[in-house]
Every structure is written in structure tokens, then in C-alpha cells.
Amino acid sequence: MITLDTLTEYLRQMMPDAAVTVSDRTGTMDHLKVVVISAAFAGKNLLDRHRLIYQALDSPLKDGRIHALELTARTSDELER
């Protein structure tokens, strides 16, 4: 289990400008929906964006604190369209 604040900090260490929204999908705090808005995604395809998020969350994924992720990764420009 991981807290929402801790998960957000992992992401912001890799992407300091990130706006992060996390929601618990099951009530167990290990199945999470994560929305990340960051300029770091500019010019990257979906797979590369997800890789960046997985790199940031490597530790809690490997130690089992996160079991499943539903990801949305956008730039702020993409939100405005």
C-alpha cells in the first residue's frame, strides 16, 4: 500500500512540473488511477510517456505497494484541445 502523497512525490521527483491526480480504484490503495499532466511528455508517444511514469514509480511497483495502474499522460496543451 502506498499513500497518494507518496506516489505524487515519486512522480514529481522525475517531473517537477507535473500536475498529478491519483484515485484509489478498489479501496485497497494498490489499484490506482493516475493522471499526470506535464511538459515532459511533449514530443513523446504514449508508450514513452508511460515508460517515464513507470520509471518514476519503479520502487513501489517492484516492492508490491502498487499492483495495478490505469494511466493518463498528457501535456497541458493537449488538455486545452
Show where each model-derived region lies:
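N-proximal, solvent-exposed amphipathic alpha-helical segments enriched in charged/polar residues
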Residues: 1-19
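Short, non-transmembrane amphipathic alpha-helical segments
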Residues: 7, 11, 47-64
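Short edge beta-strands and adjacent turn/loop segments
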Residues: 17-33
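Short loop/turn motifs enriched for small/polar and acidic residues
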Residues: 25, 37, 72-76
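Short Gly/Pro-enriched loop/turn and capping motifs at secondary-structure junctions
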Residues: 27-29, 41, 78
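C-terminal structural segments of small proteins and small subunits
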Residues: 54-81
